[in-house]
Every structure is written in structure tokens, then in C-alpha cells.
């Protein structure tokens, strides 16, 4: 079992499988049986370190450790959509703060994650006539703000929409462009996407390099 979490544009893996170490590079930081009380400091150091791109936390009591890890953070729930056109050969992307991303945002109080995902896509792209296809794996992202540690848990759904709908970027959310991407477009902009978005696309076989 491996838990994957993102921090800035880096990966944290939490596992009890030492065989993962066979595939590491010199840009990987490894912590064996880390003390849960030291985790926040470890994460801050890793986040600010330019040398390491991946952190592996190895615990032989994985489930217990992960629950304690999860409880270190204030959890923020979000939802978003991987929106396909009708022929399933294009994906809807947004350009926010100069980075290509997928439409997503916070879940409102009392709102289901499905409704939140549809609402966020509608608000951020102007595409509101959406058909849900299926629930995808969630992504986890750690960030720090005002001396607090947060874990954003985003619930993703694949969706379908007509390609000829008007695209309206939500300017107040700093969205500059909404655009349908072909696989070639994704490949051309791959280096200007967040690692979590790349992982979501690849793990669901929506894109292959």
C-alpha cells in the first residue's frame, strides 16, 4: 500500500513496502519509522529544499501512522472535473496564474462532492451542461498558511460536455483562458502543469507520454 500526497510540486509517498527503494534516485529523501511529532518540521524542510523532489516515509504500522499523519492537518475538501468532449478525445483545461490546470474548488457546507465538482466546472469555465461519467481517485495536497498546516483533499470526477459550448474563464478566480486540449496539446504543455494533475491524468489512463 502506498499513499501519495503532493506538496508544492513535489511528491510524498507513505508506505510500508521497502521494495520501493529499488527505484529511488539521488533526489529522494527517505525517512524510516519517522516520529509523528516531527512530521510537520520534516515536511517544511522538504518543501523548502531545492535538492529533493520526493519524500518517502516508511512505516511498518502503516494504517496507524497514516491516520496520525492525516490528523496533523486541517482538512480542506474540494472537488473538480476532468471534462471530456463528446468524442472523448479532448480535455477541458484552464490557465490560472500562468499554469495549466483542471477546474476545481472548495466544497460548500452541506454540498455533495458531485454537485460541487459540477458547480466548480460551471463557474470556472462557463461549461454547465455536464454529464458525470464516474468518480476518480482523490488527490491530496499539503500547504502551509498563517502557521497552520492544511491538507486539501480534492474529489475528482470524469465528465462529458459538448465541445461547441461557449468557454468563459472566471476572471475573479484569476483564470485567464479556458481551452480544449488534444493529447498533443497536453504533451506540448506538460512542463507547465502541476504534478498532481499529471498524476491524475496518467493514473487514470487519460494520457500517455
Regions flagged by a language model, labelled:
Residues 2, 78, 152-156:
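Short hydrophobic/aromatic beta-strand or adjacent loop that forms the aromatic wall/cage
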Residues 5, 10-31, 99, 170-209:
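Nudix hydrolase/Nudix homology domain
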Residues 21-33, 84-122, 127:
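Conserved Nudix-box catalytic region and its N-terminal flanking loop in Nudix hydrolases
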Residues 36-80, 86:
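Acidic, metal-coordinating catalytic segment for phosphate/diphosphate chemistry
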Residues 80, 90, 177:
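Conserved beta-strand and immediately adjacent loop positions that scaffold enzyme active sites
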Residues 107-195:
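Unchanged
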Amino acid at each position: 500500500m502506498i499513499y501519495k500526497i503532493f506538496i508544492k510540486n513535489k511528491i510524498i509517498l507513505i508506505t510500508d513496502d521497502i521494495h520501493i527503494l529499488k527505484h529511488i534516485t539521488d533526489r529522494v529523501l527517505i525517512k524510516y519509522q519517522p516520529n509523528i511529532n516531527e512530521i510537520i518540521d520534516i515536511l517544511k524542510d522538504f518543501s523548502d529544499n531545492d535538492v529533493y523532489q520526493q519524500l518517502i516515509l516508511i512505516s511498518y504500522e502503516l494504517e496507524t501512522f497514516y491516520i496520525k499523519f492525516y490528523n496533523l492537518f486541517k482538512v480542506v475538501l474540494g472537488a473538480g472535473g476532468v471534462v471530456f468532449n463528446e468524442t472523448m478525445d479532448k480535455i477541458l483545461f484552464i490557465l490560472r496564474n500562468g499554469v495549466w490546470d483542471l477546474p476545481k474548488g472548495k466544497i460548500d457546507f452541506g454540498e455533495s462532492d458531485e454537485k460541487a465538482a459540477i458547480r466548480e466546472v460551471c463557474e470556472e469555465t462557463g461549461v454547465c451542461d455536464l454529464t458525470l461519467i464516474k468518480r476518480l481517485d482523490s488527490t491530496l495536497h499539503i500547504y502551509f498558511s498563517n502557521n497552520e498546516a492544511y491538507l486539501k483533499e480534492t474529489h475528482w470526477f470524469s465528465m462529458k460536455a459538448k465541445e461547441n459550448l461557449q468557454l468563459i474563464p472566471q476572471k475573479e478566480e484569476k483564470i485567464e483562458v479556458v481551452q480544449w486540449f488534444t493529447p498533443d496539446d497536453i504533451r506540448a504543455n506538460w512542463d507547465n502543469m502541476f504534478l498532481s494533475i499529471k498524476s491524475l491524468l496518467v493514473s487514470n489512463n487519460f494520457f500517455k507520454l
